[in-house]
Amino acid sequence: MSVVGVAGLFGEGVESYDLPRRQLVPCFDEFYGAILELVPAGLGDSFRVLDLGAGTGLLGAMVGRNFPRSEVTMVDFSEEMLDAARSRFSDESEGRYTFRLMDYAREPLPGEYEVVVSALSIHHVEDDAKRRLFREVHRVLVDGGVFVNGDQILGGTPEIEARYHESWLRRARELGAGEEDISSALRRMETDKCATLESQVGWMREAGFASVERRYENERFAVYSGRKDAP
C-alpha cells in the first residue's frame, strides 16, 4: 500500500484514535516511560526535538510536559492526524510546537536537533526506507544528539511472531479493548512492515550511531536508542 493509502487509514476515526491506546498498547506506561527516560537529562534549559510520525501529538505532549523548555517539531504524513495534534496544543505557548506534513521516510528531514523521537510509526515503512531514515536522522542530529525509537517489532521466527500476535489480542481484550477498536487496529496492521529488534539496532550502528541501547522489550513492543558522536 502506498504512503497515501496508509495516511488514509490513519485519518479515519482520528477523533477517537487515542482513546483505546492504553488497551491496544498493553504495556503503555512502561513503553512510553522508557522513551522519556532515554531523553538525556543534561541537555540544558532549551533543546530541539523532532517527533517522527507524531500522529495526534501524544508523544510530543509527553515530551513537552516532562521537558517544559523543549521545542518540539512534529511531522506526520496524515493531515487529519496533524490537525488533531494542532488542536491538542492550541492553548500552548506560541512557537514552542510546530507541525509539518511530510513523508519522513522519503523526504529530507528539516532542521537540526538535539533529540529525535518516534513512537509506533517507523514500522509502517519498508526495511530499506528504515535504513535510509536512520542515516537521515543521524544527519540532522547535532553532535551528542540522541535518537529514541519506540515501536512494534517482528518476532524472530514465525512461531514467535504468532505468539506475539495471540498474546497481544488476549492482553488487549483483558484490558477492555472493544472488538471494534481491535478490528480497526488489525486493519491498520495489514500495512505494517515490522522488522526484528536485532535488525533495527544493526541498522542504527550501520547509520553511524554509537552507544546503541536496547532499553525496553515486551513481546511486540520495544524501545531502543543511539547517540551521534562527534567525528
Indicate where each model-derived feature is located:
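Core SAM-dependent methyltransferase catalytic element
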Residues: A210-P231
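Class I SAM-dependent methyltransferase Rossmann-like catalytic core
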Residues: G11-D29
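Class I SAM-dependent methyltransferase SAM/SAH-binding core
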Residues: L50-L52, T56-R106
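N-terminal, positively charged/glycine-rich alpha-helical extensions of SAM-dependent methyltransferases
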Residues: M1-S16, W168
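A short glycine-rich, Lys/Arg-flanked "PGG" loop and its adjoining helix->strand segment in the class I
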Residues: R131-D143
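A short acidic, Gly/Pro-enriched loop at the edge of an enzyme's catalytic core
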Residues: P108-V116
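Conserved alpha-helix/loop element of class I SAM-dependent methyltransferases that forms part
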Residues: C27-D45
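C-terminal alpha-helical "lid/dimerization" subdomain adjacent to the S-adenosyl-L-methionine
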Residues: G150-E206
